[in-house]
């Protein structure tokens, strides 16, 4: 998640690498910059930490997500490992970023109530300093200025710049009205640059802060480098590697180090060419492939997004669409090397975002005419996702429909060939930092010929989403909670409701080649026979099903934490 330079506990410097993982709590790796020798320290709590800093007491501090904890490591007493200091605000689950105040305290910004918290290493006192904005959820960045005041960047619906004065314990907005953006969907980013001054990045451009005066500037100094005491700088780092530049000699040394992880969280799985299984982990985004024919799994490589949200097998290649920005990428398994980029020689080749209103591309399906349809959740601070139509011949978006369901996200899609319609389900939420304005999710039909929505209804009043939709034998099937709905495209009527063995898992429902529907709930695999109108088979999973969905002739695959699971399907006959 990050790298800093900090004391090694013996009068010198060390590099500290912060790793999140899903199979166990996060860990910290202390690395000797001269040799690459590494020591690993596992945390007792917390899956990961965005915030990482060397404190004024020469200890290393981390701030976690999923708990909002302050963790501490003392390089002078490594035998104590990583300790839990505590939770400074009971309401907060994320500590995003730290900075050290002129008063010697650590300050951190939070989510989901956009608070500022502090910790005094000298006394051990933690303090909840309150909300920095009355309605926003994200206090995403902060920096302490030369005057000792703390500047906080707010988002995502109404970006703001707030200053907190430790001397008075008061805070207020200092964003000039002429620089405010009233449109939804914006962050204000705060940094302290190499000149020691505070700069702000926002929709209005680059701003400089002098005490509580804010002015626009054309440029700003660079961010302070990660610098060792002898002047060497960390110019690049990754998982198990780093580069050090010596400005005196003009040379760059590249080194590696070793660590042991318990596995990254699998975020999505999908079917690839020849019955292979593709998947993506989350934070970091790493793509893997499993070949059932030989029983071999391999790590293909990484991409710069957070995680792949949808996978589609197309013409012996694989489309991978990732968060953020719903960036579309095409991977060719026939080419031997993984080389991510935008050039013609890259594999996967990245084509950029699919369009306005797309951030998290949850649904991606084949549609009529060989086109691909992508449904997404909108960007941070915005309502109303979108559905894009992608042409694989040109590898670009040729149509895009924002707010196809007003103020809602598109979370599932299916093409029903007999009617020629694209059916889908929404989620009644918007992007991060927003609050739903619509009471219930909607089920809809889109006509590719007319290029418009031709049907919309709440099949389940009060439902928050329709997480999985599929088409088979002239009918459309969609889900809400632990219910499966059968919908007739000819009459546009709901014709049947069946109970499922638990709440439906997202994008995890499809037609097997034998005509039966195979789906996943959070705890079970189920098989639905449309001709009989009933669930004819279900099997409890030995682990919680956290993501799907790859269906082959013989099995269904899903992810649970860092592990890929397979369930061999029984021999059941349906309509071919």
Where are these regions (language model features)?
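Beta-strand-rich domains and repeat architectures in extracellular enzymes and scaffolds
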Residues: 1-26, 264-266
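Surface loop/turn motifs at the tips and blade-to-blade linkers of beta-strand repeat domains
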Residues: 41-45, 85-91, 130-135, 175-182, ...
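Residue-level signature of beta-propeller blades and closely related beta-rich strand-turn architectures
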Residues: 21, 66, 112, 156, ...
């Amino acid at each position: 998640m990050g790298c800093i330079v900090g004391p090694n506990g013996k009068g010198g410097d060390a590099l500290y690498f912060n790793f999140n993982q899903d199979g166990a709590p996060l860990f910290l790796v202390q690395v000797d910059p001269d040799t690459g020798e590494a020591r690993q320290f596992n945390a007792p709590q917390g899956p990961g930490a965005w915030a990482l800093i060397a404190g004024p007491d020469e200890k290393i501090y981390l701030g976690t997500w999923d708990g909002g904890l302050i963790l501490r490591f003392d390089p002078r007493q490594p035998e104590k490992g990583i300790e839990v200091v505590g939770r400074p605000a009971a309401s907060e689950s994320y500590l995003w970023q730290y900075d050290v105040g002129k008063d010697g305290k650590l300050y951190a910004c939070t989510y989901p109530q956009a608070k500022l918290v502090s910790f005094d290493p000298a006394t051990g006192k933690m303090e909840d300093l309150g909300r920095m904005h009355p309605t926003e959820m994200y206090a995403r960045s902060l920096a302490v200025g030369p005057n000792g005041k703390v500047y906080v960047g707010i988002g995502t619906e109404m970006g703001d710049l707030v200053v907190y004065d430790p001397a008075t314990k008061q805070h207020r907005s200092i964003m000039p009205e002429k620089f405010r953006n009233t449109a939804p969907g914006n962050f204000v980013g705060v940094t302290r640059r190499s000149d020691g001054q505070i700069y702000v990045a926002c929709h209005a451009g680059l701003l400089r802060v002098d005490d509580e005066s804010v002015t626009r500037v054309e440029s700003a100094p660079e961010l302070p480098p990660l610098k060792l005491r002898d002047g060497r700088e960390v110019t690049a780092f990754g998982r198990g590697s780093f580069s050090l530049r010596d400005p005196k000699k003009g040379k760059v040394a590249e080194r590696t180090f070793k660590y042991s992880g318990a596995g990254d969280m699998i975020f999505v799985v999908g079917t690839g060419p020849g019955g292979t299984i593709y998947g993506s982990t989350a934070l970091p985004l790493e793509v893997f492939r499993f070949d059932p024919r030989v029983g071999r799994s391999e790590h293909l490589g990484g991409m710069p997004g957070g995680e792949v949200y949808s996978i589609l097998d197309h013409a012996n290649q694989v489309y991978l669409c990732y968060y953020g920005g719903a960036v579309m990428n095409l991977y060719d398994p026939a080419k031997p090397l993984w080389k991510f980029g935008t050039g013609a020689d890259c594999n996967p080749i990245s084509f950029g975002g699919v369009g306005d209103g797309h951030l998290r591309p949850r649904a991606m399906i084949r549609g009529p005419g060989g086109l691909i349809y992508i449904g997404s959740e909108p960007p941070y601070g915005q309502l109303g996702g979108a559905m894009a139509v992608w042409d694989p011949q040109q590898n670009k978006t040729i149509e895009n429909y924002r707010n196809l369901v007003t103020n809602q996200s598109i979370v599932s899609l299916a093409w029903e060939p007999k009617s020629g319609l694209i059916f889908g389900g929404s989620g009644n939420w918007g992007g991060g930092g927003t609050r739903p304005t619509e009471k219930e999710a909607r089920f809809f039909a889109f006509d590719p010929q007319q290029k418009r929505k031709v049907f919309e209804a709440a099949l389940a009043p009060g439902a928050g989403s329709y997480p999985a939709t599929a088409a088979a034998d002239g009918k459309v099937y969609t889900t809400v909670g632990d219910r499966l709905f059968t919908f007739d495209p000819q009459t546009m009527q709901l014709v049947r409701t069946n109970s499922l063995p638990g709440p439906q898992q997202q994008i995890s429902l499809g037609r097997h080649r034998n005509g039966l529907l195979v789906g996943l709930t959070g705890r079970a695999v189920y098989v639905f026979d449309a001709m009989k109108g009933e669930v004819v088979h279900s099997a409890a999973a030995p682990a919680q099903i956290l993501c799907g969905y790859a269906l082959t002739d013989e099995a269904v695959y899903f992810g649970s934490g860092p592990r890929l699971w397979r369930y061999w399907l029984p021999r059941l006959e349906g309509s071919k």
